[in-house]
């Protein structure tokens, strides 16, 4: 799932600077109101990212507006099976001018377990989180493990750790160590084959 490159957007709202200006805000729900800020190269288009943590009975969505690069915009979406019948999903929509059109979330996958599993975890504000077994479904035959942090002026560094099943390994690069405000930094990216569930 090449589009998983956008996982770097799960807890980022990208950088700033250049001639184009875009809305900057984040909120729980479907929309947010913020302020306009200038974009920095290579972020040359305006964008809106929707994130969703969903299970069979509950879903929580957040919206984030900022500047994005055209190449990231082409990636579109990502879906990670984090276990306990839950997914973390993202959709990115970009445009030359505001407002950007929304891209709806489809229903949760109805795929059946495929005989594989991965460590699953959703850790926010921590790089260490309790693991559990995520049962892979459908075409999910890879395990992903992503650790990073986002530096904010307030409340400071926001760490995160994501683990679960994916359909293919993303192409992600580790970030340089720095503390520029409003930037996301990937510290660990691992992707390997899922584990076969032992037959009894």
Curated annotation (Swiss-Prot):
- The signal peptide stretch is 1-19
Q: Does the keyword Transmembrane apply?
A: no
User: InterPro entries, from UniProt?
Assistant: CNF-like_PLA2_Inhibitor (IPR050918), LY6_UPA_recep-like (IPR016054), PLipase_A2-inh_b-type (IPR016338), PLipase_A2_inh_N (IPR004126), Snake_toxin-like_sf (IPR045860)
Disulfide links within the chain: 22-46, 25-32, 39-67, 73-94, 95-100, 118-143, 136-165, 169-191
Q: Is 4Fe-4S one of the keywords? A: no
Q: Which GO terms describe its cellular component?
A: extracellular region
Sugar-bearing residue positions: 176
Highest taxon of the source? Answer: Eukaryota
Subcellular location per UniProt equals: Secreted
For molecular function, the Gene Ontology terms on record are: phospholipase A2 inhibitor activity
Keywords, alphabetical: Disulfide bond, Glycoprotein, Phospholipase A2 inhibitor, Secreted, Signal
Q: Quaternary arrangement and interactors, per the entry? A: Occurs as a mixture of oligomers. Tetrameric arrangement appears to be the predominant quaternary structure.
Q: Which family does it belong to?
A: Belongs to the CNF-like-inhibitor family.
As for what it does, the entry says: Inhibits the enzymatic activity of phospholipase A2 (PA2).
Q: What is this protein called?
A: Phospholipase A2 inhibitor gamma subunit A
User: What lineage does UniProt assign to this protein's organism?
Assistant: Eukaryota, Metazoa, Chordata, Craniata, Vertebrata
